[in-house]
Amino acid sequence: MLKQLLYLCFILNALSAFSYKEDSTLSQLKIIEGKINPKSIAHSGNGLFFAQNMMYKHTVTVYNRNFQLLKTISDKVELNKYGYSRRKGLYRGSPVECTFTHNGRYAWVSNYNMSGGSETEFSKPGCDNCHGTGIYDSSFVYKINTSTLLIEAIVKVGAVPKYLAATPDSKYVLVTNWSSSDLSVIDTEKLKEIKRIKLGTYPRGIIVDSTGTKAYVTIMGSSKIAVIDLRTFEKTWIKDIGRSPRHLCMSPKNDYLYVSLNGDGVVGKIDLSTNEVMKVKTGSLPRSMALSRDGRHLYVVNYGSDTLTKVTTLDMKVVDNIKTNDKPIGVTYDDETNNIWVACYEGSIMVFHDSYYDSTVKDSLYYELLAQNAQEIDFRKKLPLKDKRPMLESEIEKPVDILPDKIIGNKVNEYYLIAGSFKNKLNAEKLVKELSIKGHNSFIYFNLDNQFTYACVSSCSSKSMAIEKSNALKEGGISVWLYSVR
């Protein structure tokens, strides 16, 4: 028994030389500028990115994965053409946030407030410091067809609508009304508000669990989160989580809630079985967040410190911090490209690439080691860590399949176009195979310095040629970055 315990301890220690380490791999990919002041950025799930430009530009700008502007949608509407017969003339909105329904077919955009019409219309607009039921003008949510990029319907909600979230079945769109201190429930088939739920001062962020039965709403003027049963519309509370909770994300298994606490400058992880909160400092005034599809990484924009922070959700540790343009306020994640889009309020959208890819193949090294005979490994010798690797590799039948020790690919050229970087070579091989099926002459390059295996789309002898190829690949929908071996 003692030998078995000693062997297990040795295995766990030895694996530290081989085991996966969280990689800090954020890099800036693109800056989009123009006539924009984005308050938020949202991904449709199908390669469209909607930026909401508030009353400063009165537009929604729509981009594709190649960073091309597809359309600038004006917030100018004729309300009488959308069922509001008493509203004559032209009106303007002020796009704030966006969510999607029906697998990305429709975008729903909130408008901070409305203007236009007669002098008596919209004469009591809400504001950031305004709150109270029945005092301020109601506003509207636009429904936009993502195929035509046209406004198809308009739904009246509360005062200063901000965040929106849809149920998984696309039956409801929920909207927080900042100044009227409540939540609107929109029936997407009836195209009208069917319920108004009183919440408290400054409701903001919303997340709906994957079952579609519960919605969580932050009350930014408090330290509480409302929990709403979407079958009965009754509410309960998670209390004392921290000051000014703003944005929410939820783990894939619905067991943890992530919240940005704007007043405390931290991000919290709430265990929903106990309501205990684990917190991490990310930067000044953390605002919006995005969660990777596997739930391992949280991306946080810090409005006061102009940074994008990457956090591992397992232990709530900061693993990367990268500078952004002024006032980052919105963020969205594209799990097809591993790109993070950041809305910077002062007038730009920044796109960052995270070269971390989730392992889809279990590391067989662990199982190979467990299969070995403990007595054959002399763990009594005090060897430096770098000397343990050859000893362990001698016990494994196929070490090259797990830890390649040579460069595979074209060693003559100096510039490589990288589509992905991996700790596990098998994952790199998987991506190379996928690229080859698409007609690319892809190959693997192993970097001895950082122990990453790169999936390369191409290699070039000059930087100018590499940039030209990179641009051509991006036009074809493949994001790459350049790696120089000089």
Question: What is the role of each PLM region?
Answer:
Residues 350, 413-416:
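Short structural boundary motif marking the start of a folded domain
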Residues 36, 55-57, 93, 136-139, 391-413, 423-486, ...:
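Extracytoplasmic
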Residues 16-397:
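Predominantly soluble domains enriched in secretory-pathway, periplasmic, or organellar proteins
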Residues 4-13:
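Sec-dependent N-terminal signal peptides
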